[in-house]
């Protein structure tokens, strides 16, 4: 197997899924979605959507041969807000931006020194930016703290995105104030119909790209597990749940990944994946934080 952190790093500029390596297999580049769901990528690859609008199965490689596995599309890093609104400045003090030269994923501050994000957002070097609203402007409220430890869930699966959760230990504690503070972990699982708040600096378009400078918010309900599984047959595990609208139009998107889904003041979800952004019958899929509360607490205790 060869993936973004293995023997072909030049092919993978950002977080991605593992691929089987074969002669002539090249990394796909983002292209336009064509009729029938196919997409044309780099090196002559014909691509078909698999998960998240980020990962595609290659039908043939650069030499015209059958590709051996899945190709992770470099998506400039990760997931999205479509159909939302600009958040009130510093109204979500738990929201963080993960930066590696530029913003690439979101996260949530759960204690003075720990952040929850998505495992597929993993990079070896991450700067956590707290107190942000406009990520292109220094507004005077920010705290930039490097990651001291980056810990993916031990059972994270890059192919299925199961257990898509990661902890980041800050090199020094955040200074808690009105603009930087923590969000509580869940005490009960997310109930269908509950209104939640999703936030991030991700793409605001279902087709094309428009990345905002200011933090975007989206109010959306938790869907039933039956609705979630019907939207993605065979792909929803017990660690995943769906939030959004089956009619489409509102969703998280690229570069929102790792960010928070907050319901009744508790961190219930982590932005994980979806098929496209804000497509009909393709709601966003989120990591169910409730399932990982014990792992989070045990990991923090073991790395304090």
UniProtKB/Swiss-Prot annotation:
Cofactor: Ca(2+)
Physiological role: Digestive protease that cleaves proteins preferentially after an Arg residue and has proteolytic activity toward Kunitz-type trypsin inhibitors.
GO BP term (any one): zymogen activation
Activity control mechanisms: Not inhibited by Kunitz-type trypsin inhibitors.
Binding residues annotated for Ca(2+), in chain numbering: 132, 134, 137, 139, 142
Family affiliation: Belongs to the peptidase S1 family.
Keywords for this protein: Calcium, Digestion, Disulfide bond, Hydrolase, Metal-binding, Protease, Secreted, Serine protease, Signal, Sulfation, Zymogen
Cofactor, how bound (note): Binds 1 Ca(2+) ion per subunit.
Modification sites for Sulfotyrosine: 211
Major localization listed first in the record, in broad terms: secreted
SMART domains per record: Tryp_SPc
Name by which UniProt lists this protein: Trypsin-3
InterPro entries hit by this protein: Peptidase_S1_PA, Peptidase_S1_PA_chymotrypsin, Peptidase_S1A, Serine_Proteases_S1, Trypsin_dom, TRYPSIN_HIS
Sequence ranges assigned to domain Peptidase S1 in this UniProt record: 81-301
CC terms in the record's Gene Ontology section: extracellular region; extracellular space; tertiary granule lumen
The enzyme's E.C. designation: 3.4.21.4
Cell compartments where the protein resides: Secreted
S-S pairs: 87-217, 105-121, 196-263, 228-242, 253-277
Catalysed reactions, semicolon-separated: Preferential cleavage: Arg-|-Xaa, Lys-|-Xaa
First-level EC class: hydrolase
pH dependence: Optimum pH is 8.5.
Source superkingdom: Eukaryota
Molecular-function annotations in GO: calcium ion binding; serine-type endopeptidase activity; serine-type peptidase activity
Site features described as Required for specificity, chain residue numbers: 251
């Amino acid at each position: 197997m060869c993936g973004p952190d293995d023997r072909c790093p030049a092919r993978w500029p950002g977080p991605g899924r593992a691929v089987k390596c074969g002669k002539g297999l090249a990394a796909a580049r983002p292209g336009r979605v064509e009729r029938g769901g196919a997409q044309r990528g780099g090196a002559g690859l014909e691509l078909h959507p698999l998960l998240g609008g980020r990962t595609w199965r290659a039908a043939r490689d650069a030499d015209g041969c059958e590709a051996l596995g899945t190709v992770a599309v470099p998506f400039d890093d990760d997931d999205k807000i479509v159909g939302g609104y600009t958040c009130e400045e510093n109204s979500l003090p738990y929201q963080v931006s993960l930066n590696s030269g530029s913003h690439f994923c979101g996260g949530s501050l759960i204690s003075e020194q720990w952040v929850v994000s998505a495992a597929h957002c993993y990079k070896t070097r991450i700067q956590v930016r707290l107190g942000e609203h406009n990520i292109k402007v220094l507004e005077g409220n920010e705290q930039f703290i490097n990651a001291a430890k980056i810990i993916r869930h031990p059972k994270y699966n890059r192919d299925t995105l199961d257990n898509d959760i990661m902890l980041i230990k800050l090199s020094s504690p955040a200074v808690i104030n009105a603009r930087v503070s923590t969000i509580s972990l869940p005490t009960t699982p997310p109930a269908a119909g509950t209104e939640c708040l999703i936030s991030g600096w991700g793409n605001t378009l279902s087709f094309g790209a428009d990345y905002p400078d200011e933090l975007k918010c989206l109010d959306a309900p938790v869907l039933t597990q039956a609705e979630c599984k019907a939207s993605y047959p065979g792909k929803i595990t017990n660690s995943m749940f769906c939030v959004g609208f089956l009619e489409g139009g509102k969703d998280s998107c690229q570069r929102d990944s790792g960010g928070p889904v907050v319901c009744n003041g508790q961190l219930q979800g982590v932005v994980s994946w979806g098929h496209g952004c804000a497509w009909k019958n393709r709601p966003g899929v989120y990591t169910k934080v409730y399932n990982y509360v014990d792992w989070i607490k045990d990991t923090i205790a073991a790395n304090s």
